[in-house]
Each structure stands twice: as structure tokens, then as C-alpha cells.
């Protein structure tokens, strides 16, 4: 989804977030070096994805060979970034974070939040802008179904404060002018169409197998790429498949770069039960799978123990 939404705009701005219709910054966290990372350029989808990668909930993403997580770990209210990078006339700050509760024995998410979140400064000088504070104590980290409800709360509060906001703005553009600017910008946004596929990871045969799932004699659309993606990971042989869209100015189309991790070919398991009676059982099983020119699955299992019958 991130690639589908953001790849065309990454291509249009040539990896410089200042060239977007609205200049953008994302904040991520490098937990190894214990510091925040300001993302000003690169892949727009990766930047957005990194800024929401809360530890233990979402997998981190690798940017410039560094695993990065949610920027809120070290800076959950980056007013300093806004001022240093943009020096805006007015900042509208939105605070939805609540004071962390004392860790509870039976609340894993609360324990994780207390472990990873650092204290942030949620102050905004009145001369710098307007601060909105929301009480969302009934909304948890994973309450995605409440997204529209939360957005409406923010919208309604903004409309209620619109007079105060407008009083701080020295000039305005008409809706028609802004709409025309937006149309001109979007007219230069390339369509997400692929004509080449490259695969990194695994051995040669595994890369060829994955590439053939996506490759086509003709350019293919984002929807076709999605179908091939889900088909490739559906059999469980691929542990991770990370796609990136890389724009080619000469062709006007995108290269689909895929980073793959393949499960081990051989998996062995055993189990059984031991009792004080003669009904002891031992089970041994092996599963062998290949990802090559032809995908293959083999299962072998056996058990040792006295035969018995049961009924229910």
C-alpha cells in the first residue's frame, strides 16, 4: 500500500521532500545509536512507514543500512524540526498523547509503551503557533477501526478554531487558485507502471522463481504487481518480500525492485506423549520445500508406539 500511494510522488519530487506539493518531514528513531533521524529525502513510502513502526507491533524498516522505528520514541512533538527546517509563520500543533499509565501486570501494550517511549516536550510558544490538545484516552495504539472517528474529532476542533487560525495568517489564496496549483502539480505525477523486475536475496534459482511471478512481456500495472505479490507469498515459502518502485526517467516507467527472504528448505519437527501406561507415542515429521524454477513441497512423517483405538 505504501508503494502504491507514495511511489509516484517520490519519483516526481526526485527524492527531495521539499519538492512535494506540501514540503514534508518524517521523524524516525535509530534505537542502536539512541537518536532521532530526520527524513528529508529518499523514498517517501519508506519515510512514512518508518515514522509509524512502533516496536514489537510493526516491523522496523531499513534506511541507509540502519533499522529505524517510530520517531515518537525520541521526539513525539517535533516543533524544533519544523522551526529549523521551515521557519513557518505559524505552527498548528496537535497533541493526542496521554500521560503514560503505570505499567500493569496484565497489560502488555502498556508495558511496551513504558519501555520504549521517552519523555517529550509538548510545549509550543504562543508566538509560534496554536496548540490543540485532545483527550483520546479511550483509543489504543491498535484501534485502527476508530480512524474515521478520530479524524472527525480533529476536523471538528479545527473548524471550531478556524477564526483564531485565520487571524494568524497574513495572506490567503482563493480556493480556485489553490486547486489550479494542485492540478498542475498532479499533471506531472507519473503513473505507477512497471516494465522491469529485479530481485535481491536467495540463490539464483530462487531469484528467478520470484522474478517470473512478476515478469511480463508487457508493462504491467500496480494492480497486477499486487496480484503477483500475494500469489508469491501465499504458499508460505517466502518469509519476507519487500517491493520498491524505482523511477526510470528515460522510459517514464518504474523498475520493481524486490528484496526477498526465503524460508529454510528443510524443517524437522517431533512430538508425542509419554504416559505410565503402554500408550506411548513418538512422532517425527519433515517438510522439504523448494523455491526454484518449479516450486515443490514434500512431507514425510512417521510415528512409533503401540497401536490403540479410541472412540467418542
Each model region followed by its residue ranges:
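Patatin-like phospholipase
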Residues: 1-223, 227-230, 234-241, 245-247, ...
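Gram-negative/organellar outer-membrane beta-barrel architecture
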Residues: 223-224, 228, 234, 240-312
Amino acid at each position: 500500500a505504501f508503494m502504491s500511494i507514495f511511489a509516484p510522488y517520490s519519483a516526481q519530487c526526485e527524492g527531495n521532500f521539499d519538492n512535494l506539493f506540501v514540503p514534508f518531514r518524517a521523524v524516525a528513531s535509530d534505537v542502536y545509536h539512541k537518536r532521532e533521524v530526520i527524513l528529508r529525502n529518499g523514498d517517501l513510502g519508506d519515510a512514512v512507514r518508518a515514522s509509524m513502526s512502533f516496536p514489537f507491533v510493526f516491523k522496523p524498516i531499513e534506511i541507509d543500512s540502519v533499522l529505524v522505528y517510530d520517531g515518537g520514541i525520541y521526539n513525539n512533538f517535533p516543533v524544533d524540526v519544523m522551526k529549523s527546517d521551515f521557519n513557518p509563520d505559524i505552527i498548528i500543533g496537535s497533541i493526542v498523547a496521554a500521560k503514560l499509565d503505570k505499567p500493569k501486570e496484565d497489560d502488555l501494550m502498556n508495558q511496551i509503551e513504558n519501555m520504549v517511549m521517552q519523555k517529550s516536550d509538548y510545549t509550543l510558544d504562543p508566538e509560534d503557533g496554536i496548540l490543540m490538545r485532545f483527550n483520546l484516552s479511550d483509543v489504543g495504539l491498535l484501534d485502527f477501526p476508530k480512524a474515521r472517528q478520530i479524524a472527525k474529532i480533529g476536523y471538528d476542533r479545527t473548524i471550531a478554531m478556524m477564526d483564531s487560525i485565520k487571524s494568524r495568517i497574513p495572506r490567503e489564496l482563493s480556493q480556485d487558485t489553490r486547486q489550479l496549483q494542485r492540478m498542475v502539480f498532479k499533471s506531472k505525477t507519473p503513473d505507477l507502471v512497471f516494465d522491469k523486475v529485479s530481485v535481491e536475496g536467495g540463490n539464483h534459482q530462487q531469484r528467478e522463481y520470484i522474478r517470473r511471478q512478476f515478469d511480463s512481456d508487457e508493462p504491467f500495472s500496480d494492480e497486477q504487481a499486487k496480484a503477483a505479490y500475494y500469489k508469491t507469498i501465499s504458499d508460505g515459502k517466502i518469509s519476507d518480500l519487500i517491493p520498491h518502485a524505482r523511477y526510470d526517467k528515460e522510459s517514464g516507467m518504474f523498475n520493481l525492485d524486490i528484496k526477498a527472504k526465503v524460508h529454510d528448505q528443510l524443517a524437522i519437527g517431533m512430538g508425542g506423549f509419554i504416559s505410565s501406561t503402554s500408550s506411548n507415542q513418538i512422532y517425527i515429521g519433515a517438510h522439504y520445500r523448494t523455491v526454484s524454477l518449479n516450486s515443490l513441497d514434500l512431507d514425510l512423517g512417521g510415528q512409533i508406539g503401540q497401536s490403540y483405538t479410541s472412540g467418542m
